[in-house]
């Protein structure tokens, strides 16, 4: 294909993309990715149209999910059909009070507008309904140079490792300040290093699939964003770390899906981030990093945990995660301070409108608290489907923690098949931990407000513990808590 034809092809694809992004009244059902067989356990239809139900079968506890894009608050009729009579069901978030109608093996219910939902039928595996808000990415991409990854003769079947070609496309597109577009396909790759002044746009059925060879990751991560400014990943496509689908079996441990450090002005919007071997996304020594409308799908084991955190803001400031769902085997939304040089503080962090499922903490500060200060940390509007600990501050190093808010939590269940009791509140300063630490910290000013427990509290504990008179916890205000 000559250069002229390639350029024309890119323009045509770009035009098609923009037309496809026009808002419509009917929901748009996202197509299958094609990397694994679809779910046989669940059949889902939306307004009478059959949806593709993905199955992450290689996780310790497999999950199923389908994606929809919805414009506005149009009512959607959801029908879920399974292979057995439905004896019980639950639709989370429970606070929305969604009631369905059961006839034999079919569950019918209605949702109004976008939202993230989990349907639990009998003792079956979880079904995630990911109903995304329509985002006008066309407006966000306006006036930028558009490059199609297919211009680089990339294999889109997932059978060939394409790291070098994709990296070349990233480097060349960044020099233009452009948008690198990934159309439908499976793109197998090792570590990719992002650049400043670049946007990646993932089509609905685009899948960036990590290699299962640990040697293809120089810095133990799939998406590496280091010393980068003005970078975005947009779209409803998927980035997969291949953690439980092969990378762990080949000896990989503690590989991030996304690792950003020394960055400024980073945006992720709409993408699915799934199956890392370790923390899904770590943001370190960075500022103005904002995640919106994310779907984070990690491994969650039957017992204990697997260090598969959701989103970790570490030694960073002015960052946020807004409107997300996180399925994780460890802590869901986390704030840390691993900067031992104490150059950075951790400040102005917001987590808002998040649906969580975890074997450990739903919302947490710590345990790594090496920075001088944590300030203005807010966890708001959190629906907790399952956790071991709901609200956590573990100050195990030397720091000062202030202006922390846990507000508008809806906790559906506490469950942890380990030895320790679950906890609603766990604020602790200590020098006794699984690692060497000092516990020379202070916590002063925590607001716990409007916390609603939607299950019984049998066996659930709470604790607020200082180390001593000097390193202690002060000014914790708890108001508006209910148990239903």
Predicted feature descriptions by range:
Residues 1-26:
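Bacterial Sec-dependent N-terminal signal peptides
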Residues 22-484:
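Extracellular/periplasmic carbohydrate-active domains that bind, remodel
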């Amino acid at each position: 294909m000559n250069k002229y034809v390639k350029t024309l092809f890119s323009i045509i694809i770009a035009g098609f993309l923009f037309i496809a992004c026009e808002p419509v009244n009917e929901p748009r059902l996202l197509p299958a990715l094609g990397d694994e067989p679809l779910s046989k356990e669940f059949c889902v239809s939306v307004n009478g149209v059959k949806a593709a139900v993905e199955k992450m079968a290689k996780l310790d506890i497999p999950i199923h999910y389908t994606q929809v894009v919805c414009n506005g608050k149009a009512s959607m009729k959801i029908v879920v059909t399974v292979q057995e009579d439905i004896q019980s069901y639950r639709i989370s978030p429970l606070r929305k009070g969604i009631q369905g109608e059961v006839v034999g093996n079919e569950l019918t219910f209605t949702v109004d507008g976008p939202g993230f939902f989990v349907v639990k039928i009998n003792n079956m595996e979880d079904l995630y309904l990911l109903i995304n808000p329509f985002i006008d990415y066309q407006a966000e991409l306006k006036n930028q140079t558009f490059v199609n990854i297919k211009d680089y003769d990339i294999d889109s079947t997932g059978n060939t490792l394409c790291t070098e070609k994709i990296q070349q496309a990233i480097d060349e597109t960044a020099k233009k300040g452009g948008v690198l577009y990934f159309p439908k396909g499976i793109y197998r790759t090792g570590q990719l290093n992002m650049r400043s002044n670049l946007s990646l746009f993932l089509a609905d059925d685009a899948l960036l699939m990590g290699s299962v060879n640990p040697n293809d990751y120089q810095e133990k991560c799939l998406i590496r964003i280091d010393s980068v400014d003005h970078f975005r990943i947009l779209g409803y496509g998927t980035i997969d770390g291949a953690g439980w689908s092969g990378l762990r079996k080949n000896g990989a441990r503690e590989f991030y899906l996304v690792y950003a450090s020394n960055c400024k002005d980073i945006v992720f919007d709409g993408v699915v981030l799934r199956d890392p071997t370790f923390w899904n996304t770590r943001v370190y020594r960075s500022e103005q990093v904002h995640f919106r409308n994310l779907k984070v799908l990690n491994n969650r084991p039957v017992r204990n945990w697997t260090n598969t955190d959701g989103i970790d803001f570490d030694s960073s400031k002015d960052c946020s995660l807004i409107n997300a769902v996180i399925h994780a085997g460890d802590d869901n939304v986390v704030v840390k301070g691993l900067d031992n040089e104490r150059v950075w503080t951790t400040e102005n962090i917001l987590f808002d409108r998040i649906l969580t499922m975890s074997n450990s903490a739903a919302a947490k500060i710590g345990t790594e608290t090496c920075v001088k200060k944590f300030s203005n940390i807010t966890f708001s509007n959190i629906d907790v489907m399952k956790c071991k600990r709901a609200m956590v501050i573990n100050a195990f190093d030397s720091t000062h923690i202030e202006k922390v808010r846990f507000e508008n939590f809806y906790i559906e269940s506490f469950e942890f098949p380990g030895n320790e009791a679950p906890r609603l509140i766990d604020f602790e300063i200590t020098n006794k931990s699984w690692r060497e630490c000092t516990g020379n910290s202070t916590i002063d000013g925590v607001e716990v407000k409007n916390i609603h427990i939607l299950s019984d509290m049998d066996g659930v504990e709470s604790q607020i513990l200082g180390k001593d008179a000097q390193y202690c916890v002060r000014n914790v205000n708890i108001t508006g808590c209910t148990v239903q």
